[in-house]
Amino acid sequence: MTDKRKDGSGKLLYCSFCGKSQHEVRKLIAGPSVYICDECVDLCNDIIREEIKEVAPHRERSALPTPHEIRHHLDDYVIGQEQAKKVLAVAVYNHYKRLRNGDTSNGVELGKSNILLIGPTGSGKTLLAETLARLLDVPFTMADATTLTEAGYVGEDVENIIQKLLQKCDYDVQKAQRGIVYIDEIDKISRKSDNPSITRDVSGEGVQQALLKLIEGTVAAVPPQGGRKHPQQEFLQVDTSKILFICGGAFAGLDKVISHRVETGSGIGFGATVKAKSDKASEGELLAQVEPEDLIKFGLIPEFIGRLPVVATLNELSEEALIQILKEPKNALTKQYQALFSLEGAELEFRDEALDAIAKKAMARKTGARGLRSIVEAALLDTMYDLPSMEDVEKVVIDESVIAGQSKPLLIYGKPEAQQASGE
């Protein structure tokens, strides 16, 4: 096709679709006996884009994975936490099934399945949420509950969470309404006591109150992209009842609250069961027995707990689990560093005793899987600094002494004869 203003006879040309003359448009594209202007081309593009948007949800509906498939995918990236994976798989499946079929089924209204994850630092709470969003191909954003305050106070408003989600999907409201929001450190907004306070608690109970409607489902008014620069623009209306909220926290001390309830409820006097010290449950076993009343005693308000009906507890990772995390998942830490070293033409080998030493160090720090990267990074720092300037390094070997800081990694060089032969 060619861009024409006039035909060979000098006759005025018109768009075959909208009828505008060549003087009323910027471009007029000629085909066999027909013409189309740039405005009609733009209009056609808009129509096609709208049709693609309408077709996309139907594709998503047919692609909803089953709980078994969700669990299997989580197994590829997250080690252990079997019960938490099962709980998450069912809750996420039910949530998106609810969206697919509408809020009602046979006249029965389907409630939201927002999730509360309870587990120590580095046990995989954030990774589980991220992996779910990646599997389902939905927008995902994280928020830190400690930065949130009630509207009108210094800090971040809860509505900013929805704005972040919109940013992740280029302000496409329909996409955002199918997204996942992970709110971390939710235990840090517990009120100071389990009795209602007459004083203002803008970063504790106040934030819980502010989050209530957002998590349960409301229409949040969010300024559009560049909203502050263009205050005359209308706000975007986002229905949060379709967004899956996952809240997570370490809840340090919750095990003691549960233990007190369990021991108090076991009875006193001659008929009571006397437990030896050795029979005391571990922290993970206690957290698995969590009840709403325990969370209320911890400092969450009853209304907030009611908006998080699905509770999954995660155990503290064992030394064996940390070793598995280092080498087994698809994006395992050792695989990541091996890929980095391969870009420099060198092979990176972690000996088994090195992995044991890394896991022991992380256990001592009580940072869970989160502390593994900093330990490996410290051990490899000097090598990663020097390697790009070095020649002929074929292999780097990491053993226990390197992790302990007692020696440097073993560097294995290529044979000089091979270099000379290649040079000839």
UniProtKB/Swiss-Prot annotation:
Entry keyword set: ATP-binding, Chaperone, Metal-binding, Nucleotide-binding, Zinc
Residues noted as binding Zn(2+) in the record, renumbered to the chain: C15, C18, C37, C40
Name listed for the protein in its UniProt record: ATP-dependent Clp protease ATP-binding subunit ClpX
Subunit structure: Component of the ClpX-ClpP complex. Forms a hexameric ring that, in the presence of ATP, binds to fourteen ClpP subunits assembled into a disk-like structure with a central cavity, resembling the structure of eukaryotic proteasomes.
Binding sites annotated in the UniProt record for ATP: P120, T121, G122, S123, G124, K125, T126, L127
Pfam families documented for this protein: AAA_2, ClpB_D2-small, zf-C4_ClpX
Domain ClpX-type ZB: 2-56
SUPFAM superfamilies per record: Glucocorticoid receptor-like (DNA-binding domain), P-loop containing nucleoside triphosphate hydrolases
Taxonomic lineage of the native organism: Bacteria, Pseudomonadati, Pseudomonadota, Gammaproteobacteria, Enterobacterales
GO MF annotations, alphabetized: ATP binding; ATP hydrolysis activity; ATP-dependent protein folding chaperone; protein dimerization activity; unfolded protein binding; zinc ion binding
Annotated TM spans: none
GO biological process, alphabetically ordered: cell division; proteolysis involved in protein catabolic process
Family stated for the protein in its record: Belongs to the ClpX chaperone family.
Known function: ATP-dependent specificity component of the Clp protease. It directs the protease to specific substrates. Can perform chaperone functions in the absence of ClpP.
Classification via PANTHER family: ATP-DEPENDENT CLP PROTEASE ATP-BINDING SUBUNIT CLPX-LIKE, MITOCHONDRIAL, ATP-DEPENDENT CLP PROTEASE ATP-BINDING SUBUNIT CLPX-LIKE, MITOCHONDRIAL-RELATED
A GO CC term assigned to this protein in UniProt: HslUV protease complex
